[in-house]
A protein has these predicted regions:
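Accessory terminal regions of nucleic-acid processing enzymes
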Residues: 1-268
Length: 268
């Protein structure tokens, strides 16, 4: 794998004046930072099959209403505030660059970074801005960082050829309900991520081959429903793969066990 450090990211497009749909079209030209967790099977929101369908432009059979659309919208609108709080707490200069970048050695790797940081020595790093509800703050306990965010930022560091990033998260309505973590570049972790992303792009997306499902059973079931529709006994049966069948059976079994545990708990 070519992981030489003497490269500069390419600018794919200036995003300042892009519409939402135009921006999404450019994102489909490659893999973005927020896609990394799905490829690694660690996304809390989507399976690798969902990501594949999005990249090749498959329209869902059922457009399900996003349960967390408000949280996503709040997170987007508060990015500037998160950056402002981070700058105030650290004294570091932060600034946006409204461009989508591309890795020159792996052109399927894209990066649309929230903010950049200028450190006192003149070097540049990355700032990723997040929000979460108060109950989710425990995911940041003991200097922790949610794994999907770690993968997102490692992807960005690789594309931008930078060595340090901060991830900042606001979980309340004042600046004291705020955490930030530093993430240094890790070449071994980066190489593994690039290898997995390369395989996904070249073996699945470019060849139009559906990747096998993996990850949480509830996400798999939601994905099957989204792209194959609800069951209708009046129409012919559809076929699913053996892996999909096992995942569905596992999900149903776990759901039943959870239901039984909740019943016993209420009876105690």
């Amino acid at each position: 794998m070519n992981t030489a450090l003497n490269y500069q990211p390419e600018v794919l497009v200036d995003t300042a004046d892009l519409s939402r749909e135009e921006w999404l079209d450019y994102r489909r030209l490659g893999i973005g930072g927020s896609d990394a967790a799905a490829i690694m099977g660690l996304s809390p929101f989507a399976t690798i099959r969902d990501l594949y369908f999005d990249k090749i432009g498959v329209t869902p059979v059922i457009e399900e209403e996003e349960e967390n659309w408000v949280a996503k919208e709040v997170g987007h609108r508060l990015e500037d505030l998160v950056a402002m709080i981070f700058a105030k707490k650290t004294g570091l200069e932060v600034f946006p660059v409204r461009k989508m970048f591309r890795h020159p050695l792996y052109p399927f790797m894209l990066a649309d970074v929230d903010y950049f940081i200028r450190f006192p020595d003149g070097s540049i790093g990355i700032l990723e801005c997040k929000t979460c509800n108060y109950n989710a703050k425990d995911k940041w306990a003991d200097d922790g960082i949610p794994e999907n965010y770690v993968l997102q930022v490692r992807h960005y560091l690789a594309v931008m050829n930078m060595n340090k990033a901060y991830i900042a998260c606001l979980y309340g309505n004042n600046e004291n309900e705020f955490v930030y973590r530093c993430l240094e570049r890790d070449r071994m972790e980066e190489e593994e991520l690039i290898e997995q992303e390369k395989y996904f792009w070249e073996e699945y997306v470019e060849k139009k081959i559906e990747p096998p499902y993996s990850g949480k059973p509830d996400l798999i079931l939601a994905s099957i429903r989204k792209y194959k529709g609800y069951a209708d006994k009046s129409i012919p049966e559809i076929s699913i793969s053996s892996l999909e069948s096992r995942s569905l059976e596992k999900y149903l079994k776990l759901s039943e066990e959870k239901s039984q545990l909740e019943k016993r708990k209420k009876g105690d």
